[in-house]
Design a protein with these regions (language model features):
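H-loop/switch region of ABC-family ATPase nucleotide-binding domains
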Residues: 164-165
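ABC-family nucleotide-binding domains
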Residues: 138
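The feature captures the beta-strand-to-loop junction immediately N-terminal to the Walker
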Residues: 19-21
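Helix-to-loop junction immediately C-terminal to a conserved catalytic motif
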Residues: 34
């Protein structure tokens, strides 16, 4: 099911929660914003670079957590010290230091989810889209990830849009909420 019409602007540094039940159109809307699928009608525009972290990425054997995060940085764009610095920052932000040298295929689904999110933090982008970033995470890590997203948005001016099933999960960590009910847009929750 796809979301209904949406007429919305996002401010630099705004952290927006997109919520709704299964099939309400959260992932479809995220993919449309990311340019991965065309809109069914109308148009949209995104200024700057957009990074999307999908709900699920397959674990690849033979990479450490650190190497997995590093693969998100485009070769030739940054020097070795810049790459190291970006990966260090992402590892620190997502509190992955204790597993950074572990094989990515051997970490828990929750730790893998955090590593996937960390890949977004290695890139210079103006818009960050995260499709259910708190999937597979326990309560403490959900809070840590959502508060980190809010901090990143505020500190860097990056617009962050994340989706979730649970409106209570992220409402306190977002500046605004877009609630998709049954595949159609319903008014944002205050």
């Amino acid at each position: 099911m796809a979301a209904g019409p949406l007429d919305r602007s996002f401010a630099d540094g705004e952290c927006v929660m997109l919520c709704g039940s299964n099939g309400s159109g959260k992932t479809t809307l995220m993919k449309t914003i990311a340019g991965l699928i065309p809109p069914m009608g109308g148009s949209f525009s995104v200024s700057g670079k957009t990074v999307m972290v999908p709900t699920r990425i397959s674990k690849v054997k033979g990479f450490t957590v650190r190497e997995f995060i590093q693969t998100s940085i485009r070769t030739g764009i940054a020097g070795a010290s810049d790459v190291r610095e970006a990966v260090d920052r992402a590892v620190d932000l997502l509190r992955l230091g204790h597993i950074q040298n572990c094989d990515i295929s051997h970490v828990s689904d929750g730790e893998f989810q955090k590593a996937c999110i960390a890949t977004a933090f290695t890139r210079d982008c103006s818009v960050m889209l995260l499709d259910e970033p708190t999937a597979f995470l326990d309560v403490a890590n959900r809070i840590m990830v959502l508060s980190t997203l809010k901090e990143i948005a505020s500190a860097t001016g990056t617009t962050v849009l994340f989706s979730t099933h649970d409106i209570h999960d992220g409402a306190i960590y977002s500046d605004s909420v877009i609630d998709l009910g049954g595949g159609s847009l319903i008014p944002p929750v205050a």
